[in-house]
Amino acid sequence: MQLIDIHTHIYPDEIAQKATDSIKSFYQLGGGGMDGTEKMLREKGKEAGISRFVILPVAIRPDRVMGINDFIRSRTAGKPEYVGFGTIHAGMEAPAEEAERLLFMGLRGIKMHPDSQRFAIDDLRLLPMYDAIQGKLPVMLHMGDQRYDYSHPVKLRRILDLFPKLQVIAAHFGGYGMYETAYDLLKDKDCIFDVSSSLMFMEDGVAERYIRAYGAERMAFGTDYPLWDPVTETERFFRLRLTDEEFDQIGHKTAERFLEL
């Protein structure tokens, strides 16, 4: 079965381990054995049977956005196994202009992590960008954190009400650790979801229940490398009690349709 990993991150080799450790520290996680390099992603992906990877960057500081986007382009351009996204920060001078530059560079979407970037999904500074990219660039949003409300699902609902043509991937079943709240707020909105960084925290049968409530056609497979080992996450995914059709849909068809791969 073909697999597309819709949720991965890579870093320059010289800072990859430090960046990975920083992410784990942010979530108070330890170990894992992943180093955040492109090389390890490819090795682990091959072992897991993953054929394509969506590469998602995040800029914690506004002044690093352009350099990070240039790095992602340099690592993904001309490589059919990669789908490169750029990143945006609400604190940068002109988010909409950088989004246009991403299009020019051939990057395929925008990734934002509101909790680590410290701005809300519905930050007023982002509204012109959301308007400009409707129907042009999809947005992958980290969703949910019990410590902050930057990425609360209600904020995404507001944005989707304002910009109904905005293409959004709501990561982590729409809200890490707040799955029922996310479902109540987003079940009727036009967005898709990924399963990353969630399956290990759900009790038996919960993932299947939400997958079927949303519909497999709205769910996409993701590992959140280097937070987790793609091999382990792929095995965890295939332990779900789903039909072959549901595995096929989540494993690659949703990503292919949504990202026009």
Residue map of PLM features:
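Mid-to-C-terminal alpha-helical segments outside catalytic/metal-binding sites
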Residues: 1-9, 13-52, 216-220, 231-261
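A generic "structured core" feature
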Residues: 3-11, 102, 129, 162, ...
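Conserved, mostly hydrophobic/aromatic
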Residues: 7, 45, 72, 102, ...
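A cross-domain feature marking catalytic cores of carbohydrate-active enzymes
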Residues: 8-10, 57, 86-90, 112-114, ...
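Active-site environment of divalent metal-dependent phosphoester hydrolases
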Residues: 11-14, 60-63, 90-94, 117, ...
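A general structural detector for well-ordered alpha-helical segments in enzyme core domains, enriched
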Residues: 40-44, 68-75, 98-102, 125-129, ...
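Active-site gating/metal-coordination segments in enzymes
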Residues: 51-52, 60-140, 145-146, 201
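Catalytic pocket-lining loop regions of alpha/beta-barrel enzymes
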Residues: 108-109, 119-220
